[in-house]
Amino acid sequence: MSMKVYVTDYEYATLEPEKRELDKIGAVMIPKQCKTEADVIRECKDANGLIDQYAPITRKVMEALPDLKVVGRYGVGVNTIDVDAATELGIQVLNVPDYCMDEVSNQAISLMLACHRKLNILNSQVHHQGWDYKIAKPIHRLQGQILGLLGFGRIPKMVAQKAKAFGLNIIAYDPYVKPEVGLQYDVTILPLKDVLQKADIISVHVPLTKDTENLLNEQTFSWMKPEAIIINTSRGPLIDENALYHALKDKKIGYAGLDVTVQEPIQEDNPLLTLDNVMITPHVAWYSEEAELELKMKVAQGVADVLSGKKAKYLVNRDVL
């Protein structure tokens, strides 16, 4: 009997790349559009493997799927999956950590430049028949300013390399990275408070975990410079949005460029949408045609490898082995 791999949910125009990879091991791919635990349990009950985008893969779900061996996640983060429960149940969890490094680092740099130059304000004015650069004052020279990176993994390292071209001095916070690693990139590794106090621009790249949720909050905003720019291309819940709104509204910080929000799509009554010192894009940082194809192929390859008895390249919960 053929193994069954369910795509729990997806927003892509085609799943042909996934199907091609799973065909190689004779697995049947079954696409669904699950939104809840109950949906996944009902629709995917005989799954050998899952490929997941946003559907919740909880302990309850995994315990209800007796044949489940592997869950592959579209993307870098695995916050939709209870990884600890998966490990206890002997289920391998996979991600694709390297498919969009160029795209996300470019988005972070783009938001940084757009916020620094206040392009949204200027563009909006021109669209409303205005023509006055002075509405964006003051803008200070970017060269020589300090960029603070929260996290120093693959993507922020690429951000650091690109930011050097603009003459930025770069510092970073990452409790898992030794100072000598930072020095290889001409980046100084510092404690969180020091980074937030010194940086003119703060770019968030840490993964979302129980420990990092609301990493940026009322207290940490109080450590920042009043003109500080915050960029987030990682995960929305890393920032306390209510605290962010008040910090921006009260001019305790200067600007925010967000590609992610706590609720996605963003709710129409989100107060951040009322501020002109916020730029928000719809979780697009990961996207290019090439990155999308790479993501789809790699997640399916990983699931196929596990189901055919091979070692997966991008195994998240290594303790499961």
Give short role names for the model-derived ranges:
Residues 32-33, 74-75, 91-102, 174, ...:
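Short beta->alpha connector loops at strand-helix junctions that form conserved
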Residues 1-47, 307:
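N-terminal glycine-/charge-rich "phosphate-binding" loop or analogous flexible N-terminal tail
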Residues 152-153:
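Glycine-rich Rossmann-fold phosphate-binding loop(s) that bind the pyrophosphate
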Residues 56-62, 175-271:
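Rossmann-like adenosine-cofactor binding region
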Residues 7, 147-149:
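Hydrophobic Val/Ile/Leu positions in short beta-strands of Rossmann-like dinucleotide-binding domains
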Residues 89, 94, 218, 227-321:
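Rossmann-like dinucleotide-binding domain for NAD(H)/NADP(H)
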Residues 89, 97-146, 158-161:
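Phosphate-binding beta-alpha-beta segment of Rossmann-like dinucleotide-binding domains, i.e.
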